[in-house]
Amino acid sequence: MAVYAIGDLQGCLSPLEALLEQLRFDPARDRIWFVGDLVNRGPDSVRVLRYVRALGEAAVTTLGNHDLHLLAVWAGTARAKRKDTVHQVLDAPDGEELLHWLRFQHLTWRDDDLGYFMVHAGVPPVWSLDEAETRGRELEAVLRSEDYLAFFENMYGNQPDRWDEGLTGWDRLRYICNAFTRMRYVDADGRLDLRCNSAPGSQPDGLYPWYEVRERLRPEPDPLTIVSGHWSTLGLCQRGGNVAIDTGCLWGGSLTALRLDSDEREIISRPCPAFLEPK
């Protein structure tokens, strides 16, 4: 059995099919971890959801910011943006079924035997991996309950940007959501900055990639390697205890798979056509 983590798809099905063919993926034998952002901006969001859902137990998915944005538009608490392609899901005959399936996906996923912990954007420096898993389950429980509509009414916003165990209600859940699905940069103390999305080296003074601060602030190395996506301008990055695998498939980069069951870190990438031009 082979186990792979695959980077952000954002509605790009043909590169996924080509990559899985290259990997000789067999759903009866192998397993895929999708790092999130299955949908939006690309041409085939609804077909991607159908494809991944049909994989059943052969696939596991963590939710990304574009996945949650789709759910918020469906809930009527957000508007689609100009370049969004979420309406193909909303208008599909099986759209409701796909959207309910999507909201039952994970915020984090771990396998101690394989030695990996998956999340869309990253793990804030102030949390251990065990704490991160617990925080993820808090938000998962709300998304899977009748309170999911109320959550989407309160999801958007950049505050609070600092974790406090005393946070409650929507503030607490918003921080958890932002940390797992939107985080790129933090300050030296781990405070979130959700405005800057450029490549490392071009950020304002006083901001650092979250994984650099995590490496510095954590008293001991993480017991599992974090695998994340979300940050296409970062690209493939192996730093300390994190492997980032969003390599910009949507923008004409590549779609990347990281093999998780191998003693050596094997990375396989497939070039992608540009489905959308960068700004």
Curated annotation (Swiss-Prot):
List, alphabetically, the PANTHER family matched: CYTOCHROME C5, PTHR40942
Which GO MF term does the entry hold, naming one? bis(5'-nucleosyl)-tetraphosphatase (symmetrical) activity
State whether keyword Hydrolase applies.
Answer: yes
What is the similarity comment for this entry? Belongs to the Ap4A hydrolase family.
EC numbers for this chain = 3.6.1.41
Q: Which CDD domains match?
A: MPP_ApaH (cd07422)
Q: Which UniProt keywords apply?
A: Hydrolase
Q: Pfam families given for it? A: Metallophos
What function does this protein fulfil? Hydrolyzes diadenosine 5',5'''-P1,P4-tetraphosphate to yield ADP.
Which species does this protein come from?
A: Alkalilimnicola ehrlichii (strain ATCC BAA-1101 / DSM 17681 / MLHE-1)
Protein name, as recorded: Bis(5'-nucleosyl)-tetraphosphatase, symmetrical
Reaction catalysis annotation: P(1),P(4)-bis(5'-adenosyl) tetraphosphate + H2O = 2 ADP + 2 H(+)
* Domain of life, per lineage: Bacteria
Extract the NCBIfam families matched here. Answer: apaH (TIGR00668), PRK00166.1 (NF001204)
